[in-house]
Amino acid sequence: MDLRHNGRNNEYVTNQRSLCSPKSVNYKMSAKKFRHITVTAVVIANMVGTGVFTSLGFQLLDIRSGFVLLMLWAVGGLAALCGAMTYAELGAAMPRSGGEYNFLTRIYHPAAGFVSGWVSVTIGFAGPVALAAMTFAAYATTVMPGEPSAILEKSLAAGLLIILTCVHATNRRNSGAIQLIFTILKVAVIVLFCIAAIVLVDSPQPVNFFPSEGDGALLTSGEFAVALIYVSYAYAGWNAATYLSSELEEPQRTLPWILMTGTLVVMTLYVALNFVFLYAASMDSMAGELEVGYIAAEVAFGDVGGRFTGIVLAMLLVSTVSAMTMAGPRVIQVIGEDFPTIGVLGRKNKDGIPANAIILQSSIAMLFILSSTFESILVFAGFTLALNSFATVLGIFILRWKQPDLERPYRTFLYPLPPLIYLTLTGWTLWFVLLSRPVEGLFGLGIIGSGLLLYFFSSFKAANTT
C-alpha cells in the first residue's frame, strides 16, 4: 500500500482499496476533544495500578538486594521514558487515534497494523483491564471479615468492569471527569502514603539501598531481565495518549509533553513507592504475595490503618480499569473504520463514543477474569505488549529513512539514543523471558501468529468476493 502524506493538514491517502485492507480515507480529527490535562491523567492512570501494587512480591522471589530492586524500577522508567520520547515524534507526525495500530500500518504494512490491533483486542488492553480488576478485588477482600473467597473476588472484579463499561460507553463528559478525579486522588494518596509510612514506621527494615558486593552480577543476570518484564508491565500505559490522538486538542503540540510528563511523574512515584514498601515491611513477608501495599501499610499503620489503606488502594485501582476502558477501545474503533468486514466496531454513538468497541474489549476482559490466573495473564501480557512496542520504536528509523520530508512537529530529543536504549533494554528482556518462561513467551508469539493468519484469511476472502 502506498501512503502519501499531505504536509499541510497531516492527512494520509492511499492508492489501494479493498474490503479487507484499510479503506481509502482521509484520516480526520474528531470534532469533540479531550483536554490535555485529561489525557495526561489517562497516561498516569494507565501506568499506576496493577503492576506497582503487585510486582514487588514476584521480584522478591529471585532478588533480595534493595539497590537492585530499586534499579529495576529506575531502569524500567528509563526505558519507558525513551519509548515515550520516540512515540512522541511518531504521534505528532501521525496524529490519529489508534496508537501502535496507526503507526505500524503506516510504517510497515496494513498486516502489521492489523496484528498490532489484534494484540490490543485480545491481550493489550483486555488482559490489563482484567488484572487491574482482579487486583482491586484482591485488595478489597483483604479488608473484609472472614477468609477471602475466590468466588467473591471474581464477582467484585466482574461487577467493577460492568459498571465502568456502562459509564464509558454512554457519556464522554462523565468519562473524562471521572478519569481526572480518580487520577488526582491516586497520585495524592501515593504521595501521602509514602510520607506517612516513612514518618510512622518504628523500626525500618535493615535493607541496604546502596550498591554492595554481588549487585553488579545481579544487574546483568537473567533474573534481573525476567523481573524487568514485571516492571515493563507496570510501566505499560506510557503510550496511552497515542490512542486518543484524534480526540486531543492540538496533538502535534501537546502530545509529546503529555507522554513525557506522565512518564516522569510515574517513574518518580514508582521508585518512591517501592522504597517505602522495602523500608516498612520485611522481604520475607512480601515475597510471593500479591497485596504488597496492604502488607506494608499494616506494618506502618497497624491493623486498622492497614485495612483503611487496603480500601483506599482498592478504590484507586478503579481509575486504572477506567483509564484502559477509555483508551483501549479507540484502537478497536480505528480498526473497524479501516476494515469494512468488521466495520461495526468502528461505529460511534451520538456522543462520539465507540460503544461497540468498549463492549467488545470488556467482554474479553470478563473472560480473562472468569477463566485465567493472575500470574499467567501478567507474564504473557507483559511479553506481548513489550514486543508490540519494540516493533513500533524500531519503526522510527524506518520512517525517517522512507519519509525524510514528512512534517515532524516534534523530533525525538537526543535521537537516536532514546530508541536505541529502549530497543536494547526491551530486546534483552524479551530474550530472557523466552528462555526462562517459554510457555508464556510462545503463547504471546502464538497470538501474533494468529493475527497474521486472520489478516491473510480475510484478505483472501475479500479478494474472492470482489
Model-derived segments and spans:
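Membrane-interface "cap" regions at the ends of multi-pass membrane proteins
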Residues: 11-67, 80-81, 85, 96-97, ...
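Hydrophobic, membrane-embedded alpha-helices of multi-pass small-molecule transporters
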Residues: 35-53, 160, 197, 214-268, ...
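Hydrophobic transmembrane alpha-helices that form the core helical bundles
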Residues: 81-161, 166-169, 313-334, 370-387
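TM-loop-TM module centered on a large, flexible mid-protein loop between adjacent transmembrane helices
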Residues: 102-103, 109, 142-147, 213-214, ...
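Membrane-interface loop-to-helix entry segments
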Residues: 152-204, 259-263, 382-391, 418-421, ...
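Hydrophobic alpha-helical segments and their helix-loop junctions in multi-pass secondary transporters
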Residues: 184-213, 275-281, 394-406, 434, ...
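C-terminal membrane-solvent junction of multi-pass transporters and transport-like membrane proteins
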Residues: 344-355, 389-440
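A generic transmembrane alpha-helix motif of multi-pass inner-membrane proteins
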Residues: 380, 384, 416-466
